[in-house]
Amino acid sequence: MTLSEDTLRAVEATAGLIAAQGIEFTRAFYERMLTKNEELKNIFNLAHQRTLRQPKALLDSLVAYALNIRRINELYELKGKGLPVPPEHWAELQGFFSAAERVANKHTSFGIQPAQYQIVGAHLLATIEDRITKDKDILAEWAKAYQFLADLFIKREEEIYAATEGCKGGWRQTRTFRVEEKTRVNEIICKFRLVPAEEGAGVVEHRPGQYLAIFVRSPEHFQHQQIRQYSIISAPNSAYYEIAVHRDEKGTVSRYLHDYVSTGDLLEVAPPYGDFFLRYLEADEQAPADTQASQEFQMLQSGAINFAAEKTMPIVLISGGIGQTPLLSMLRFLAQKEGKETARPIFWIHAAHNSRVRAFKEEVDAIRETALPSLRVVTFLSEVRATDREGEDYDFAGRINLDRISELTKLEADNANPHYFFVGPTGFMTAVEEQLKTKSVPNSRIHFEMFGPFKASH
């Protein structure tokens, strides 16, 4: 299915009006939908509604779709005719499809189903009618444009569902897990080891950097089901997952997991998902989700670096606060996969508020000493305490500044082409990205994920 010129013009003509209303438009949409379809409160993070993070994410997505709709339509017209899509056309749409891939992974972790797209579409059109235009012809064209986008997501999400379910140890929707271990890492972080409730059952191996969605149902604590994603910190294996949960005093689920969930308790868990991961495929091995992907999403991986084939390419892991969790899975994986024999320079650069809340220091130091001698660990502390020792508890005082790490500067000067993976709070992420851009690091070597509703991963 492709779109007519009438549809393209209608969307392009009204997209600016939606953008001009800003989050007031998407906030009105969510208020309408969650009032009339209360069951969706079991899916949406209501805290993100209050902070307007979700309305802002939807606004960005709608505007991005409207701005790209003509080029997207041209792509599908070429595909429908069996004609090749020029490389420059793919390049122009890489940002859109990268964002779509991240959203599709989020949706599958929530267990989104095709019927729910019809609910969203009905309320989106009603909001356009209430706030943008009552022109029936324009509304009819927007309905076609929305269905076009919905079909794209429904198809991709089914590909992801099927690929994950088809893996050894895989499943669809949720599965019951038991908390095998709960460990307090420090005053604000707890670690949970999760195993299938069925004795002896295995799990699908995640890709280092992916996350689990935890479905929390506790009527005495929450009026509605709560769903949260937590990065997996364990290396890929077929027996268990480990997650680390940062206690947010303003949060609901993190406090619940810290205070009320204990060893032996049961949790409902979706399979591992996420498009932010370390791509490491041995010869003749293909990632499950890639085998199922349609052409436009396979193109996202066509130029991706396979670190199994690039044994000396440097990897730089940069984290702020709890952002270290997906990177810890990557580091553990590299320690297992490459170990002492690796010729690859690896950096672990971490920024923490102070040494008291810095997590996993002992483990990272142990990995460096026993498994990855090529690992260079660098710590920035915003707040240095009187008992902290430079060179042991931290390397640099203050906010993260990559220019202070001479080895990184040398790698860039020597054209070693290091790849940077970074995760953390919004301000931290912005600072790191700006510093890398200042060093003229191309997007192809920048990989990031922001915790929250939406920001495209590179």
Curated annotation (Swiss-Prot):
Function, as annotated: Flavohemoprotein involved in nitric oxide (NO) detoxification in an aerobic process, termed nitric oxide dioxygenase (NOD) reaction that utilizes O(2) and NAD(P)H to convert NO to nitrate, which protects the protozoan parasite from various noxious nitrogen compounds. Therefore, plays a central role in the inducible response to nitrosative stress. May also be involved in O(2) detoxification.
Region (Reductase): 169-457
Lineage: Eukaryota, Metamonada, Diplomonadida, Hexamitidae, Giardiinae
Molecular-function annotations in GO: heme binding; metal ion binding; nitric oxide dioxygenase NAD(P)H activity; oxygen binding; oxygen carrier activity
Pfam families on file: FAD_binding_6, Globin, NAD_binding_1
Site positions (Influences the redox potential of the prosthetic heme and FAD groups): K106, E449
Broad EC category: oxidoreductase
Family: Belongs to the globin family. Two-domain flavohemoproteins subfamily. In the C-terminal section; belongs to the flavoprotein pyridine nucleotide cytochrome reductase family.
Binding site for heme b: H107
Expression induction or repression: Expressed at very low levels in untreated trophozoites of the parasite. Expression is markedly stimulated in nitrite-supplemented medium. Induction by nitrite is probably mediated by NO, likely generated upon reduction of nitrite. Also induced in cells grown in the presence of the NO-donors 3,3-bis(aminoethyl)-1-hydroxy-2-oxo-1-triazene (DETA-NONOate), and S-nitrosoglutathione (GSNO).
Site (Involved in heme-bound ligand stabilization and O-O bond activation): Y30
Domain Globin, first and last residues per copy: 2-158
Residues the entry annotates as binding NADP(+): G321, I322, G323, Q324, T325, P326
Complex formation: Monomer.
EC number(s) given by UniProt: 1.14.12.17
Record-linked PANTHER family: FLAVOHEMOPROTEIN
Protein name per Swiss-Prot or TrEMBL: Flavohemoprotein
Catalysed conversion reaction: 2 nitric oxide + NADPH + 2 O2 = 2 nitrate + NADP(+) + H(+); 2 nitric oxide + NADH + 2 O2 = 2 nitrate + NAD(+) + H(+)
Alphabetical keyword list: Detoxification, FAD, Flavoprotein, Heme, Iron, Metal-binding, NAD, NADP, Oxidoreductase, Oxygen transport, Transport
Residues the entry annotates as binding FAD: Y211, R228, Q229, Y230, S231, M450, F451, G452, P453
Record GO biological process: cellular response to chemical stress; response to toxic substance
Cofactor(s) annotated in UniProt: heme b; FAD
Cofactor binding note from Swiss-Prot or TrEMBL: Binds 1 heme b group.
